[in-house]
């Protein structure tokens, strides 16, 4: 019995050492919670996801660690894409989505026990990807502590067809906000420079 317990504890310790177990557990719980919440039929409607800075989120300066913003943004997108039906539509079409680009700007630190909201909006899309904005808003004064822009690349289909599957009709992308236009140009310029440095042709799938 003691041997079995020791082996079990060893396996659990190994799993927690080799995998980010809490990320997968929390991600699954976020999706499950979103699935039982009311469906958000407006794809462009802003979605709010609540959070609080806990001790394990802190860096050496006792602020929320920079990497934690990206992690929390993941969970907020999971909730938004599930409640809006985006994940379900992609699954029905046999497609998937990956992060193809991300830029975050930090404006003010979030401190221990500080509560915040992540306000997620789908801004627009092109023939390959969705463009998403996420704002970290401190609830004490509604200040935007950080803002994140991401490019969610659709694999195995196109954003147009995914949206059409969700809305049961053809829907045009909203006009690109100015910051998205500049951000796309930056990404394109960076891709061209990296390809030139590595000798990769412009028709490569890797950007």
Swiss-Prot record:
Subcellular localization, as worded in the UniProt entry: Secreted
Main location: secreted
Gene3D superfamilies: Hotdog Thioesterase
Secreted in keyword set: yes
Sites carrying sugar chains: 187
Keywords in alphabetical order: Glycoprotein, Secreted, Signal
Signal peptide: 1-27
GO terms under cellular component: extracellular region
CDD domains given in the database record: 4HBT
UniProt record similarity statement: Belongs to the THEM6 family.
The name this protein goes by in its record: Protein THEM6
Organism, scientific name: Xenopus laevis
Organism placement in taxonomy: Eukaryota, Metazoa, Chordata, Craniata, Vertebrata
């Amino acid at each position: 019995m003691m041997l079995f317990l020791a082996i079990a504890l060893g396996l659990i310790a190994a799993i927690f050492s080799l995998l980010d177990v809490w990320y997968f557990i929390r991600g699954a719980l976020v999706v499950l919670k979103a699935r039982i919440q009311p469906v958000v039929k407006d794809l462009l409607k802003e979605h709010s996801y609540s959070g609080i800075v806990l001790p394990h989120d802190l860096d050496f300066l006792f602020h929320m660690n920079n990497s934690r913003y990206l992690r929390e943004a993941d969970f907020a997108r999971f909730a938004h894409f599930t409640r809006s039906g985006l994940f379900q539509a992609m699954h029905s079409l046999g497609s998937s989505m990956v992060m193809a680009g991300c830029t975050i700007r930090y404006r003010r630190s979030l401190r221990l026990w500080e509560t915040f909201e992540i306000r997620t909006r789908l801004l627009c899309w092109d023939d390959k990807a969705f463009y998403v904005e996420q704002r970290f808003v401190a609830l004490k004064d509604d200040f935007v502590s950080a803002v994140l822009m991401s490019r969610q690349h659709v694999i195995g289909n196109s954003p147009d067809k995914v949206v059409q599957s969700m809305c049961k009709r053809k829907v045009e992308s909203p006009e690109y906000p100015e910051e998205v236009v500049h951000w796309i140009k930056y990404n394109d310029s960076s891709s061209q420079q990296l390809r030139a440095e590595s000798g990769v042709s412009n028709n490569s799938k890797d950007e």
